[in-house]
């Protein structure tokens, strides 16, 4: 895998073109429906998008609507081993994280994205959901660590489907209300590990609430 350049946040003109191509395809293949788009913050708001991890197309599902800004997605490093996949994902603003290794480069890059006025997206669970019903799983600390470091709010988003997502199934993407650092308990000068874990849990609870409202 070619070494990812964490030193600068890129801008690619191909992003909007790729987004425009994929939007009608996913609407047709997955009968996709969107809810809560009014909750997507206005430009200039500092926030992170947190999404349950259902399948490889999660970034496309969530970023497709017109009022959703470019999302810089944290994705597992293994996906970047294929040169074409790496080229494509980089131009969709994905960046690699080495899972389970305390990848500080990816965390620092996530903070850079937010502090430079862009929007980062992350799947708090850290891996794809294995449950056959698609039930969201427990969050890891990463999303709360980055939110604390950048004083960013968090937009919970749930990708909802009865069972595993596949062609022909109905998918709903539900955008929740923005969670502020104060609501998450991350506005303290110093946060303990418990504070971070509680904030990550609260974010995941909100995602699960959105999911349950559509699936159950």
What are these regions (language model features)?
Residues 38-42, 111-112:
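Short amphipathic alpha-helix with an adjacent loop that forms part of the alpha/beta core around
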Residues 2-36, 83-92:
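A transmembrane-helix-recognition feature enriched in membrane-embedded lipid enzymes
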Residues 25-27, 66, 89, 113, ...:
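A generic structural signal for well-ordered alpha-helical segments
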Residues 42-101:
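Catalytic core of membrane glycerolipid acyltransferases/transacylases, capturing the structured
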Residues 28-35, 101-104, 157:
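Short gly/ser/thr-rich secondary-structure transition/capping motifs
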Residues 22, 91-98, 126-130:
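Short, basic, glycine/proline-bearing loop/turn elements
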Residues 36, 52, 75-76, 93, ...:
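A secondary-structure boundary/capping signal
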């Amino acid at each position: 895998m070619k070494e990812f350049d964490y030193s600068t946040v890129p801008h690619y003109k191909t992003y909007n073109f790729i987004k425009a191509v994929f939007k009608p395809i996913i609407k047709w293949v997955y009968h996709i429906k969107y809810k809560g788009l009014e909750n997507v913050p206005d430009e200039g708001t500092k926030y992170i998008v947190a999404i349950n991890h259902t399948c490889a197309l999660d970034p496309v599902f969530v970023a497709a609507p017109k009022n959703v800004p470019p999302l810089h997605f944290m994705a597992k490093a293994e996906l970047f081993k294929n040169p074409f996949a790496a080229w494509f994902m980089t131009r969709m603003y994905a960046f690699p994280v080495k899972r389970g290794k305390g990848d500080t480069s990816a965390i620092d890059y996530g903070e850079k994205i937010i502090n430079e006025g862009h929007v980062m997206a992350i799947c708090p669970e850290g891996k794809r959901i294995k449950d056959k019903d698609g039930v969201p799983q427990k969050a890891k600390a990463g999303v709360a660590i980055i939110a604390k470091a950048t004083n960013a709010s968090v937009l919970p988003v749930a990708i909802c489907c009865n069972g595993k997502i596949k062609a022909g199934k109905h998918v709903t993407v539900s955008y929740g209300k923005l969670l502020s650092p104060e609501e998450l308990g991350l506005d303290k000068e110093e946060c303990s590990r418990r504070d971070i874990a509680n904030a990550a849990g609260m974010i995941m609870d909100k995602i699960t609430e959105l999911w349950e409202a559509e699936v159950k």
